[in-house]
Every structure is written in C-alpha cells, then in structure tokens.
C-alpha cells in the first residue's frame, strides 16, 4: 500500500496539532469546576463523564498524522490510569505543556537529546521531592478526603469508601455495582464468597430467600466431575450418621450422582447442596486449596493420590455456616488454622510480587482478601441510567485514588505539591545550556495543572500561581470556594502515587515527540466502487413483487 511521508518540522507540527486538539478537549474536565463531556454511544443513552482517559479514548482525527500525536498522549493517560487509577487529566495537561515548550526549543535549534536529558534530570529530582513531602494516609478521615476530591467533591462517595476500607481492611476487596434505589449502599460479605451458586434449585431450603443455608456443615472438595454416586457412597453414609449437612464443591456434579443427592436432600436423609468449583484450570485448583485451608479440609485429587472412594470425615472441611444462592456461595467462619491461613496469604502475596500481568495480580488480590476475611460491595444509587454510569465511574476513580493514597501516602492537592517541589530545580544544573533548557521546560510545565484548575474555575491563573509560589508548605488555592489557605486542613489532598505517575508518564512521551524526524502513514483509500452503484439497474425487476399474494 502506498504511504504518505512527512519530515522535520512539518512532521512535528502535525503531531503537535494532534496533542493540542486532544488536550483541549480533556483539560475542560480538570478540577472541581471542570465541565462534563458527553460521549455518543452507538446504542442506548450517551455517556456523561469527567474522566480524562474516557474522553481521550473516544477522540479520533481524520488527519492520520494529527492522530498519531493524539494517540501518544492517549497512551500517557491510559498508562497513568492503569498504574495509579486516577490523574489522567493531570498527565494529559502535563504532557501537552512539556511537548509544546520542548517543540519551541527544538525549533530554536536546540539539541532534542540534550533537552530530553535535562527533562529526565528534573523529573527524577521532582519525584524524589514528592516522596519526601508525602505523608502516610492512615486514618479514615484522610481516606474520605482523598475519595471526596477524586469523586468531584462528592462527600457521600468519599465517606462510603472510607467506611468500606474500615470494614474489610486496606487490602480487602471492594467492588462497585449498580444499586436499585436512589441512595448509595454498602454491604459487607463476611468470610469467603465465590461466584458459583447451587447446581440444582432442589437444594434450596429457605424458600423466602431462595437459598440453601447449612449450619455447621461438612465441606467436600473434589477437583473432578462426579457422575456416579458409588464413588461417594462411603462419605455420604458417614455424613448421614453424623446428622450434619454437607456442601459439595466439585468441577461438576451430574447424572446419577446429582439425582441421588437431590432425592436424599428432599427426603431429609442428608441435608446437602452441591456447587461448581470457582475459577478455571490452575486457578480452580488454587482456589479449591484456599477453601481447604480456610475450612481445615483436604482437596480430593488423584494428583496427590486421594480418591472419593477412600475419603473419610477427616478429609472434609468444616465451617460455622454456609449460604448458597443462585449465583454465590458464602463460607462464614471456616474452621481453618490461623497459622496455615497466614502462610497461604504470604504465599499468594509472593506470587503477586512476581507476576507481570495486571489481571493475574487482581485475581491474586481477591484471593488474599477472601482469605483475610471480607468483601465490601458499594451499590451506587441514581435516578436514571445516565446518572448511574457517571456516578459509578466517579466511585471507581475515587476507589483507585484511595488505594493509591494508602499505598504511597498523600500530598497537598490542587496542583500545590508540584509547585512546592519546584524548589529542588533551583540548584539543579545540566551538563550544557540545552540540558538547562530541558530543566526549565519542566519547571514551567509543572505549573500547568494548577493553571488549568484555576482557569476552569474562571480565575486569573498567572496571579494565583504567583501567589501560591510565594508562600510555603501546604498554602494553596481552593478553586471550589475561591479561597486561599492550607490545602491539607481544607481536605484537598492528592495521592502521591497519582501525582508521581502522572509526571513520569507525561515526561516519557516527550522524548519520542521531540526526537521525531519522519512520520509515515497510509494514503487514504479512494471510494472506487461507489460511482458504479448509482443506477442499480438490476433492481428494476423488484417492482414485479407487487403481484405476490400475502400469506
């Protein structure tokens, strides 16, 4: 396919146009006075959002060279979202500022590689200073404040996230779901819950809740399908004699085995419920082992030389209570040994450190939380579907921000932390004048988040930036109220991880753009077939269809 080429300054100008066009649309969402952006959907209601990365992902330009510049900044926003979960608009605004200032320097004849080295030195110095300024985020009040700011100053969201973290711990799993009412709701699932329900509705013993509830049950864990009742006859007889109920967790229970269990349950011979094991493949085996450790049981597996025929009551796990619904199984107060559970948690955490997959890390984190004791579910309430989507996105952003705050601490929000970190650049020198220019580019760029927050609130950015820079510590400007003061006391906080990640990712794209000398894109295809489709002469005979009788 034929290609179109652009070189030198022409290429950089096209790329810069894409960066500016994307950033202009994203920057409008920044700060407490940021505006919403409405995104069209191919079906259903449009999406209303203030999330920078959501806006960026929707933007495509017809001009392919312009689009390349926009795509690079999209990557900055997406990487920031993946790493820190928030700060995507900040990253976009910083990236644009660095690229624009860097482009001016390259146009003036400066060496792009030396500019890059100068910017890198400045980013390293600022990052270290941010980490020095960072304060631990330990108490519920600070967590609520971080969540409130990230959720566009919605105190209800900040408070419910802080409450959820308090109940399940800072490493607990917190999920966000659509609610049924107008108010946000928080429910906490005690013990271990996995997303598998009863195999047959005939196991239900609580008709009001449509659930199977087992008090002090035995738990049989099997890593294969159970098709014949003969395999598990000895276990069933032993459980029936004990008079206690039985939960069976297996790859599947089918055919004769399922029919026999249902009949025994309905006749009251043995109170039983069967569910499929959670997960797939190796993850299923790992989760079965988690349940075994939590309930002080053993997984019946041919891989380790155990079989159903030889299983006894000693092989079974136990728990205080189990509730099985159509979709979930919850094991409450498993009778596993604390030392074994803690050892299993440590083992899973070690796997989290080693894995490079975000998906695997998330699944491992869920397993830790389930073993450690609890999952919190935030149900988002809203009047309409459009409001629900927008509110749910804000809750998820706030949740990511609070996790980041717990992980690396907090700094003064509203762009103030970057202004305070600016002082470390005063004594920083490059190896030559071009590197010094790179340091100065970053010095100006890190003012851009505060400038944008102030501009979106309708104030004069230069005056406010100068006044904030003249003061010390946490002194800043509250764009929501139009007042100056201590940002920490006013509850305006940013997670250190979010600010650091936004800066590092924004700076990473500038070297690619500043050192670009050639751009290559496919030539647009001509619509060759459209001209011949005009008369569609062969369709004339369709008129004869009028004589066809209706059936």
UniProtKB/Swiss-Prot annotation:
* PROSITE patterns given in the database record: CHAPERONINS_CPN60 (PS00296)
Please, which domain of life does this record's source organism belong to?
Bacteria
Q: What is its main location?
A: cytoplasm
Specify which residues bind ATP according to the UniProt entry for this protein: 29-32, 50, 86-90, 414, 478-480, 494
Keyword ATP-binding attached? yes
Q: Which PANTHER family match?
A: 60 KDA HEAT SHOCK PROTEIN, MITOCHONDRIAL
Q: What does this protein do?
A: Together with its co-chaperonin GroES, plays an essential role in assisting protein folding. The GroEL-GroES system forms a nano-cage that allows encapsulation of the non-native substrate proteins and provides a physical environment optimized to promote and accelerate protein folding.
> What does the similarity note say?
Belongs to the chaperonin (HSP60) family.
The molecule here is called Chaperonin GroEL
Please report the organism this UniProt entry assigns to the protein. Legionella jeonii
Q: What is the lineage of its organism?
A: Bacteria, Pseudomonadati, Pseudomonadota, Gammaproteobacteria, Legionellales
* Primary gene name: groEL
